[in-house]
């Protein structure tokens, strides 16, 4: 059994009454949520969406240094575009991501159009 934490700053990932056994951080930035989880909960996995700010990426780096696995999303349509974003390019270079899943968000939300193993 793994210890999960969810950084859900706008309450979009898990709604009230969810049945998933995990700690959920809402109403704070992803970076703050990740930092609090690392300090207080000793998570094995942190789930968050829409990584984008420098603070988000620094918090993910801190989590990776602690051995935490991340399930995260980034708004991007190709691996090449992901590499053009300096913060995410740095995470890719570090080997932070094992798998890339591209979703067809505009036409068919939630539908995977490509799955690529990176590690």
Where does each model-flagged region fall?
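Conserved P-loop NTPase
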Residues: 98-119
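Structural signal for conserved beta-strand scaffold positions within catalytic alpha/beta enzyme cores
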Residues: 6, 23-26, 72, 102, ...
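P-loop NTPase switch/communication element
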Residues: 1-39
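Switch/connector loops and helix/strand junctions flanking conserved nucleotide-binding motifs
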Residues: 13-16, 80-82, 109-112
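Short, low-complexity, polar/charged sequence segments that are solvent-exposed and flexible
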Residues: 26, 90-92, 119
């Amino acid at each position: 059994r793994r210890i999960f934490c969810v950084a859900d700053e706008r309450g979009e990932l898990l709604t009230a009454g969810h049945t998933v056994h995990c700690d959920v951080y809402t109403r704070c930035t992803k970076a703050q949520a990740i930092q609090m989880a690392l300090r207080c909960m000793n998570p094995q996995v942190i789930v968050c969406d829409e990584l984008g700010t420098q603070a988000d990426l620094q918090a993910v780096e801190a989590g990776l240094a602690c051995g935490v696995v991340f399930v995260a999303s980034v708004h991007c349509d190709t691996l090449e575009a992901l590499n053009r974003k300096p913060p995410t390019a740095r995470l890719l270079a570090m080997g932070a991501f094992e798998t890339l899943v591209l979703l067809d968000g505009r036409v068919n939300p939630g539908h995977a159009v490509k799955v690529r193993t990176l590690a």
